[in-house]
Amino acid sequence: MFVLLIILSIILAQVTDAHSELHVRRVCGTAIIKNIMRLCPGVPACENGEVPSPTEYCSMGYSDSQVKYLCCPTSQ
């Protein structure tokens, strides 16, 4: 039971990190493209033309789930 609790806490920590301000600041600037490519592997990212601009991405503080919704055609 203890091992299951540890695994669950690790998973939740990773999910929480994807939405934290520190994570968003870390992927601001030129790291945005790398982050989008990491979130949308194997598909042309943002092919619907809704790629967030670096200024918008950083000022709005998009979480990874919001970027997936905007940019990954298979996640919708």
Curated annotation (Swiss-Prot):
Residues 1-18 form the signal peptide. One of its GO terms (cellular component) is extracellular region. It is found in: Secreted. Belongs to the insulin family. Transmembrane segments: none annotated. Its main location: secreted. Disulfide bonds join 28-58, 40-71, 46-72. The keyword Cell inner membrane does not apply. This is Probable insulin-like peptide alpha-type 3. Gene3D superfamilies: Insulin-like (1.10.100.10). InterPro entries: Nem_insulin-like_b-type (IPR003235). Pfam families: Ins_beta. Keywords: Disulfide bond, Secreted, Signal. GO terms for molecular function: hormone activity. The lineage of its organism: Eukaryota, Metazoa, Ecdysozoa, Nematoda, Chromadorea.
